[in-house]
Design a protein with these regions (language model features):
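Alpha-helical membrane segments in multi-pass integral membrane proteins
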Residues: 75-83, 99-116
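Extended, helix-rich structural scaffolds rather than catalytic motifs
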Residues: 129-180
Length: 180
């Protein structure tokens, strides 16, 4: 994921400061991956690969040839989802290590989203209505895909559970209700 972030953000046209920010953000993301990896390995001792829903969102974003849609997808959608998920998890965290770690990561993620909003605000003002509608449709479709990323259907299948029954149960859970 970090490689995709670097590649998509280095496509930022002719903005040296934006490229420097993207490099800094890439460092942040690598630090986040390492923090989560260490936390999961030492505290939970169980790790699952990236889920199909999140993978499909990333594939949609990173395979689009237009730099601005990659930027919208990564800076607003993925970073926004991460920010919301980390905030919800932090509110419910009982482990003080996780709570503190998420506080630091949330600070970074909020900065990343703010950068995306500020950078795109200027760019979007140069687009035609048709181009704006195309970007809005892209973002909408990515958001539709993102709904499913909270549902651990890959895990349900792994344990041999009825996927639809487990999905409906999870949709009614306090965590999902809190996140929404």
């Amino acid at each position: 994921m970090v490689d995709g972030l670097v590649g998509s953000e280095m496509c930022i046209r002719d903005r040296f400061n934006a490229k420097l920010y993207a490099a800094s953000q890439t460092f942040d993301e690598a630090r986040h991956v390492e923090a989560f990896n260490r936390y999961i390995q030492t505290r939970l001792k169980m790790m699952y690969p990236i889920g199909n829903a999140l993978k499909s969102i990333l594939d949609k974003i990173l395979t689009d040839p237009r730099w601005d849609l990659k930027f919208i997808g990564m800076q607003l959608i993925i970073e926004g989802l991460a920010l919301a998920a980390f905030q919800s998890t932090r509110e419910l965290a009982k482990d003080p290590v996780l709570y503190d770690m998420l506080g630091l990561i949330i600070r970074d993620e909020a900065r990343h989203v703010t950068f995306g909003v500020n950078y795109l605000e200027e760019f979007v003002s140069t687009l035609s209505e048709e181009e704006k509608n195309d970007r809005a449709q892209f973002a909408y479709e990515a958001c539709l895909l993102s709904r499913e990323r909270l549902l651990s259907t890959d895990v349900f299948e792994y344990f041999g559970w009825d996927v639809e029954e487990a999905r409906q149960f999870q949709l009614g859970s306090d965590l999902i209700q809190h996140f929404q």
